[in-house]
């Protein structure tokens, strides 16, 4: 997990060899925005936010560095955090008493955690880093703050994530891969 260090009203984020240092508490999302705009995956996020909206959203997102092989979240857990993937790849798999079934590989410019984020239900799958990953997390409580303070940004984000969920549910092989 990324380190959050604070001193003299300056917040420094350390994530995968990158240090973002801004006195306003916002983080630099250039890499994420670029990953979204360059992604050709069917289930990638659409870049529905303006530069100003990305800047407003940046103060609500938390950086996460995930080494290869580490689990981001496990099937059955009740956390509702939404994750936006800037770099790396994530493996989504479902386990029961008989088998472990890989459902999808998610690449940069996409999102995971959308199922629990919207449904308030436990996670339907486990998500694990297939390679070192840089992600941005939006915990449910921070999304509530975003909704109250920047409703237009929250609506645009929900529409983009909802579109990803709809695409995944519309795709036979990814139908069970909404996490």
What are these model-derived regions, one by one?
Residues 5-179:
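Cytosolic regulatory regions built on CNB/CRP/Popeye-like sensor folds
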